[in-house]
Amino acid sequence: MAFEQTTAVLGSPVQYKMSPQAKRYTFKDLGFTETKQGNLQFDRALDMTVSKTGPRFKITVAKDLATFKMSVTTPNGLKQINIFEKEEHAELRQNLEYMLNEMVNRDCFEVVE
């Protein structure tokens, strides 16, 4: 998956873009780690149980803070999944929305109208 100006999680009707006020230290405060290439990476389990079989939410922000990519993947991170298809994933959607709303509130991303 390539870095993009605006993106959405597979199946989500909401698109996000980078905020002009985004700062590197804000991403680090939210739990992003720096890769060897200088990009910022976020990788969290959406399932709040101790189980390692739940889907993962991943965001990678380019080092220039202009483009990014995000996805919900299988536990091993190899395949994107759509948590918006089935009603049984309501808790996962709620956890995803909570994380993204916190990032929007901290001026990392903006919702595209």
Describe each model-derived feature in a short phrase.
Residues 1-7, 32-49, 100-107:
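Charged, low-complexity, helix/coiled-coil-prone segments
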Residues 12, 38, 54, 104, ...:
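Long, solvent-exposed, polar/charged low-complexity segments
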Residues 16-17, 21-67:
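Ser/Thr-rich, low-complexity intrinsically disordered terminal regions
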Residues 60-113:
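C-terminal basic regulatory modules in eukaryotic proteins
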